[in-house]
């Protein structure tokens, strides 16, 4: 059985700005096919010390979820900026609201939001649990917010200090 505690990091210096731009570019065909656009607002040279492959998996998962649950013809928004020695990454999509009581549960293994959100995708409900584990192994946090207009996933990671 899959065990989240088996995740081992192989960290190094990582340009998060470049990674996020690259993931957005890689998903261009999927976005175009669904008549979506991706608005990217990323500060230049956001550097962290982290596992590139594992973090790419986190952001790829968040973007694919945003695409799956986005209203047709709308935009997915990716923002990343440094504040107070932390980097905040927001992946947002316009679409159906996640009920307040389900926002924290979506990070549990095998959890799926009921109703029309879950009928659009066929995942096993592991993606966000894995994302949370990877982010926490990087001494970061991940949370979700949802209102009538959009759903936002906010990842906060420690920024790399000068000389690290």
Predicted features along the sequence, with ranges:
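Short helix-loop "hinge" at the ATP-lid/N-box region of the Bergerat-fold HATPase_c
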Residues: 66-67
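Conserved catalytic submotifs in the C-terminal HATPase_c
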Residues: 10-13, 32, 37-46
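Short alpha-helical Gxxx[C/S/T] motif in the catalytic ATP-binding
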Residues: 122, 127, 131
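Conserved micro-motifs of the catalytic ATP-binding
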Residues: 4-9, 47-50
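Short beta-strand/loop element within the Bergerat-fold HATPase_c
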Residues: 73-85
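Short conserved segment of the HATPase_c
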Residues: 98-112
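Conserved glycine-rich
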Residues: 139-140
